[in-house]
Every structure is written in C-alpha cells, then in structure tokens.
C-alpha cells in the first residue's frame, strides 16, 4: 500500500502471475481524513496533520467497546472554517474509522477479486505462504487482521514497511543473484 496506489500481486517462481494496481494509497487516506475533519469539526487541517491522525487513530477494525479510555481522541490544530482563526479540536477515533472504512473495504474486495482470478494450482502455495503487506499504510492498526478475516489466509507484515520497497530494489540492483528480477526497458529506435 503505497502513497498513491496499492499493488496486489500473486508471485510464483520469481514472476508475477496476476496483478492489479488500484488508485488507493496513503495519500488518499490523508485526504479522506482532511475532508472528514473539515466536515465534522469545521477545522481545516493540512496533510501532515492528517498523516499524524492516520498514524495515531486509524484502525481497520475499530471497536469502540474495546478501546482504552483516552486512546480514542487526538487533539489537533487547524483553522476554523467559520471564523478563519487558529483552533484546536479533539478528533475522535470513531469519526476517523467511519471516514476511512470504505478504503479498507475496497482494498479487501480487490484482494479477494485478484485471488479469484489466480490459477487454482497456486492455492496450496498461497495457503502455506499467505499474504505479505508492505508500504507505509500497511502498518495501520489491525489491517493485517482485517485482511486475514476477509480472506481466511495468513497475513505477514514486514518490519519498516514504509521502506520495504526501496530496500528490495536496492538488493535487486546490488546483488547479481537477483538480476533476473530486474526490469530494464529496451531502448527504442526513434
């Protein structure tokens, strides 16, 4: 789950079997948070503040009955849309969850659709290996649990998920054992 897109792929024997890229990413979540804070609290916030809210309050399986007291409010600063003056407001976790729930539904639906298009011969490998989540927004609380619940598959998360793609590219480029995974566009003769 990258900044602007989410890539869902089934990989086997070092190659992509089926793949889908959807235009949903962390930046879209940030914008959804900006929009709901403006709509519900009459406060304009910037994308950095929205990202802070995302990292602190976002939960793919939010259950307000199971939350500790005080964990469900984050105080943020912005500009009041009515007065135009700086303002502080407590943003609730349940408001953020309701605003971004559709994002997670779209991701899980896309994963299930891709798995339905996957050759049945790969089912054993998929069940054994599971799903791997990478990218900055893949570390949102309970996203792995939601995907596991929706797909009935094991979901693996990676350490430092936001840097995993660039670290992988670095390994592919620097280690000759992985050269076959590198894509090099052919020069055109224009």
Positions of PLM-derived features:
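Glycine-rich phosphate-binding loops at beta-strand->alpha-helix junctions
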Residues: 62, 123-147
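Short, surface-exposed connector motifs at secondary-structure boundaries
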Residues: 13-17, 124-129, 151-154
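Glycine-rich phosphate-binding/hydrolytic loop that grips phosphoryl groups
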Residues: 145, 156-190
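Active-site phosphate-binding and catalytic loops of NTP-dependent enzymes
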Residues: 43-47, 63, 116-123, 179-183
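Phosphate-binding glycine-rich/basic clefts of nucleotide- and phosphate-handling proteins
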Residues: 11-101
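Gly/Thr-rich phosphate-binding beta-strand-loop-beta motif of the actin/hexokinase/Hsp70
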Residues: 1-16, 141
């Amino acid at each position: 789950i990258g900044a602007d897109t989410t890539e869902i792929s089934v990989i086997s024997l070092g190659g992509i079997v089926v793949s889908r890229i959807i235009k949903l990413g962390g930046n879209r979540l940030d914008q959804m948070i900006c929009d709901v804070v403006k709509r519900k609290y009459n406060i304009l916030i910037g994308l950095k503040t929205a990202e802070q809210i995302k990292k602190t309050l976002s939960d793919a399986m939010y259950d307000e009955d199971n939350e500790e007291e005080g964990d469900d409010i984050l105080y943020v600063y912005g500009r009041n849309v009515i007065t135009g003056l700086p303002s502080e407001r407590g943003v609730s976790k349940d408001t953020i969850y309701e605003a971004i729930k559709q994002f997670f539904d779209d991701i899980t639906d896309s994963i299930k659709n891709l798995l339905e298009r996957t050759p049945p011969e790969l089912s054993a490998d998929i069940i054994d290996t599971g799903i791997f989540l990478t990218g900055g927004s893949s570390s949102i609380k309970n996203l792995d649990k939601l995907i596991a619940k929706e797909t009935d598959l094991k979901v693996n998360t990676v350490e430092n998920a936001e840097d995993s793609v660039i670290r992988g590219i670095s390994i592919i480029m620097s280690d000759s054992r992985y050269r076959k995974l590198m894509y090099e566009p052919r020069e055109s003769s224009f």
